[in-house]
């Protein structure tokens, strides 16, 4: 046994020695060129072009050693990370660029595609690109689309006699409700170019089926409610002041809020501003009231029945009203009873949030049956604790500041996010007006901004900014874009409506800033639950899915960073087919597109894209817009030729 083992060991050693000699070059062997280094194989993200209803061209580039590989593209309409087990189209190209034409695709469908290169041992994949094939009806719908044609400069039809042509002319502080009859009803502050509205009552209404074409209905209130002057004098008497009898034409009729309570019941809260001062020169301005009307059917514009007084201004300074009406820092009233916003919570609780300038916005719980405050209201003056029934603070720009530029609160609840959203108008209404939003899990706060600022318990500036004075390259742009209402269509689509004004001295018109148009805009919600308002007005453009190919080209980009009273202007940003940003603010950065979510990511910022009207084009036409958010900074964009 030992001899046999030794024999095999000897044979093995001889073979090893022979192999060693054969494989070594020795001193006389010629120099052998070393093998080139192996470059790791990589595939660029596919670029999709020439998209039709049933085909698309896909291109990728290969870097590294790619000989003797199987290579091509795999794609799927189901698997978001397609593999070679899905549909495969092999490519026989020997260069570093692969290109194939995908065919037999389904119209109007999202596809996911990536390149691959494989050996018998492994497969290398590119990143995924998604695209949407053209809908069979998409081209026809978009080609036949007619943009709204009504003029923005409506001065030629501003007269009361031409009110049937107004559409969204002469709108200020709008409030909108979707009624049982399928119409959207809009009501507003008494304001118009040249005060044309004065011939037709108060809290004017109009309605629309499509949010684009609006029918003027007229005033919902014919005269000053009978309760207003008696209530004013009741309070004045309790304050030790003499009775007054102001001219009814001098009262202000401001900022209503309309809501559907249930089938067959609609409520409109409204503001009445009393003229004059409390007790002559050297005293603060007179108070305001919030009242209530109800209607069973808003199609009956004369069917609004007044339900009387709801709440009034309250002061935490007792009867120390001898403050000059322009001594803002010593403002007599803590709460200002205008700009109501009414909300019914998912649990069935009714709340009113109101206020303008002064110390911020208070919230009051209401009785569901009457629509009036649950708590008994004491005299509207006293200490902070004594006037507590007039509301608890839910938001303020600066704690302790008695005169701050914030008004027009609008509170809504989004069941998809579980948050209450408080929209606020900032600054003066003529030019600087801009819209902010904060949110809370509770209707009465604390409300917090996107930057973490608690504006309920600590106070502070509210972010993000949703609208701001702006100007695209063509046209005059818009200013004074705020005091909004926010509503949905019951189908998951949300809208923002407010007035917007012409800038000062447009076309040589010294009164151009009094031209006020109603603007309805679409809202998109970010993935983390913040609302974004589109940079152009809603025009019922067919929402055909946007393809990646359509994004390539020039965009007008606006940074909506806060600048008091200044129109933010656009600059051109170009997106190239190879996913580079070649000009503009983010030049040198890259971009990508998620066709499924309709989100363009540029310079790391998610931009939500949507088809809307290019209102500055002549003639108006459909285009693509984007809106995005990066912490406190908002971005608007519009695709241009």
Task: Please provide the spans of the model-predicted regions.
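C-terminal motif of bacterial Sec signal peptides marking the signal peptidase cleavage site
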Residues: 19-22
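Hydrophobic/anchoring residues in structured secondary elements
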Residues: 12, 48, 107, 216-222
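Bacterial N-terminal signal peptides that target proteins for export
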Residues: 1-11
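Residue-level signal for mature regions of secreted extracellular proteins and peptides
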Residues: 11, 16-17, 53
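Short, surface-exposed linear motifs at loops/turns and structural transition points
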Residues: 26-136
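Carbohydrate-active catalytic/glycan-binding domains of CAZyme proteins
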Residues: 28-29, 135-641
């Amino acid at each position: 046994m030992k001899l046999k083992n030794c024999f095999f060991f000897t044979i093995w050693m001889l073979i090893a020695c022979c192999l060693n000699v054969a494989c070594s070059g020795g001193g006389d062997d010629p120099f052998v060129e070393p093998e080139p280094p192996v470059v790791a194989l990589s595939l660029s993200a596919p670029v999709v072009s020439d998209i039709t209803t049933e085909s698309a061209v896909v291109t990728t580039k290969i870097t590294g050693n790619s000989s003797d590989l199987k290579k091509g593209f795999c794609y799927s309409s189901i698997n978001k990370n397609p593999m070679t087990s899905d549909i495969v189209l092999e490519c026989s190209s020997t260069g570093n660029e692969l290109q194939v034409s995908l065919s037999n695709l389904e119209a109007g469908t999202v596809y996911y595609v990536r390149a691959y290169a494989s050996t018998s041992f492994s497969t290398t994949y590119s990143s995924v690109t998604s695209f949407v094939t053209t809908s069979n009806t998409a081209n026809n719908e978009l080609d036949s689309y007619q943009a709204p044609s009504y003029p923005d400069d409506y001065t030629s039809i501003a007269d009361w006699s031409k009110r049937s042509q107004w559409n969204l002319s002469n709108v200020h502080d709008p409030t909108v409700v979707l009624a049982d009859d399928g119409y959207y009803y809009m009501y507003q502050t008494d304001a118009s170019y040249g005060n044309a509205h004065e011939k037709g009552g108060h809290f004017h209404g109009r309605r629309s089926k499509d949010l684009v074409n609006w029918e003027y209905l007229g005033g919902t209130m014919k005269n000053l409610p009978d309760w207003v002057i008696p209530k004013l004098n009741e309070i004045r008497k309790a304050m030790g002041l003499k009775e007054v009898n102001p001219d009814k034409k001098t009262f202000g009729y401001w900022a209503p809020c309309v809501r559907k309570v249930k089938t067959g019941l609609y409520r409109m809260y409204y503001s009445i501003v009393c003229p004059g001062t409390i007790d002559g020169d050297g005293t603060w301005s007179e108070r305001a009231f919030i009242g209530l009307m109800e209607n069973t059917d808003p199609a009956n514009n004369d069917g609004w029945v007044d339900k009387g007084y709801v709440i009034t201004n309250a002061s935490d300074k007792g009867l120390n009203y001898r403050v000059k009406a322009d001594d803002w820092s010593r403002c007599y009233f803590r709460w200002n009873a205008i700009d109501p916003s009414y909300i019914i919570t998912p649990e069935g609780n009714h709340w009113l949030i109101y206020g303008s300038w002064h110390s911020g916005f208070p919230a009051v719980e209401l009785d569901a049956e009457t629509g009036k405050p649950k708590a008994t209201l004491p005299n509207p003056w006293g200490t902070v604790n004594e006037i507590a029934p007039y509301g608890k603070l839910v938001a303020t720009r600066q704690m302790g500041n008695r005169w701050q530029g914030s008004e027009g609160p609008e509170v809504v609840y989004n069941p998809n996010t579980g948050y209450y959203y408080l929209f606020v108008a900032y600054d003066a209404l003529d030019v600087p007006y801009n819209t902010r939003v904060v949110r809370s899990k509770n209707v009465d706060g604390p409300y917090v901004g996107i930057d973490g600022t608690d504006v309920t318990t600590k106070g502070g500036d509210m972010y993000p900014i949703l609208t701001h004075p702006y100007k695209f390259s063509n046209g005059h742009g818009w200013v004074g874009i705020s005091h909004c209402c926010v509503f949905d269509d019951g189908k998951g689509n949300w809208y923002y409506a407010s007035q917007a004004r012409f800038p000062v001295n447009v076309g040589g018109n010294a009164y151009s800033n009094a031209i006020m148009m109603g603007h309805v805009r679409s809202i998109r919600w970010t993935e983390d639950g913040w609302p974004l308002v589109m940079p152009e007005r809603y025009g019922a453009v067919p929402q055909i899915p946007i393809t990646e190919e359509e994004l390539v080209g020039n965009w007008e980009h606006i940074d909506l960073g806060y600048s008091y009273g200044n129109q933010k202007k656009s600059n051109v940003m170009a997106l190239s087919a190879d996913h580079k940003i070649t000009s503009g603010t983010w030049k040198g950065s890259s971009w990508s597109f998620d066709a499924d979510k309709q989100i363009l990511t540029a310079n790391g910022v998610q931009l939500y894209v949507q088809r809307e009207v290019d209102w500055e084009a002549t003639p108006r036409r459909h285009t693509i817009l984007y809106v995005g958010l990066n912490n406190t900074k908002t971005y608007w964009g519009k695709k241009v030729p």
